UniProtKB/Swiss-Prot annotation:
Gene3D superfamilies: Nucleic acid-binding proteins
Protein family membership: Belongs to the universal ribosomal protein uS12 family.
Xref: SUPFAM superfamilies: Nucleic acid-binding proteins (SSF50249)
Subcellular localization: Plastid, Chloroplast
Disulphide linkage map: none
Cellular component GO terms held in the UniProt record: chloroplast; small ribosomal subunit
PROSITE patterns: RIBOSOMAL_S12 (PS00055)
Keywords from the UniProt entry: Chloroplast, Plastid, Ribonucleoprotein, Ribosomal protein, RNA-binding, rRNA-binding
Species assigned in the record: Atropa belladonna
Record's protein name: Small ribosomal subunit protein uS12cz/uS12cy
GO BP annotations, alphabetical order: translation
Length: 123
């Protein structure tokens, strides 16, 4: 506990909160161009081939973004919309690609949770 004189000499510093998605620069989403589309393996104890893309954002950042859902049409030079949100078992992946916007099509034959994968209501 500081004394009154210590508090007069230098005041208490406010706690600065660090953003979990710095590349978005305070925006809800950002547009970017895929520079590489590839798969990586998750950390223990999980096992899979997770689809990710290296994306150069309009803010100038080069980030790794996860491609959610089963199957995708993304390739190099695809223009995508990126939102925040990490993937727990992929270290360094702190962003998600938004399906159903720009060049990323929605997930085919998706019935439930459609809004998260950019799928229109089936007729």
């Amino acid at each position: 506990m500081p004394t009154i004189n210590q508090l007069i000499r230098n005041t208490r510093q406010p706690i600065r909160n660090v953003t979990k998605s710095p590349a978005l620069r305070g925006c809800p989403q950002r547009r970017g161009t895929c520079t590489r589309v590839y798969t990586i393996t998750p950390k223990k104890p999980n096992s899979a081939l997770r689809k990710v893309a290296r994306v150069r954002l309009t803010s100038g950042f080069e980030i790794t973004a996860y491609i959610p859902g089963i199957g995708h049409n993304l390739q190099e030079h695809s223009v995508v919309l990126v939102r925040g949100g990490r993937v727990k078992d992929l270290p360094g992946v702190r962003y998600h690609i938004v399906r159903g916007t720009l060049d990323a099509v929605g997930v085919k034959d998706r019935q439930q949770g459609r809004s998260k994968y950019g799928v229109k209501k089936p007729k």
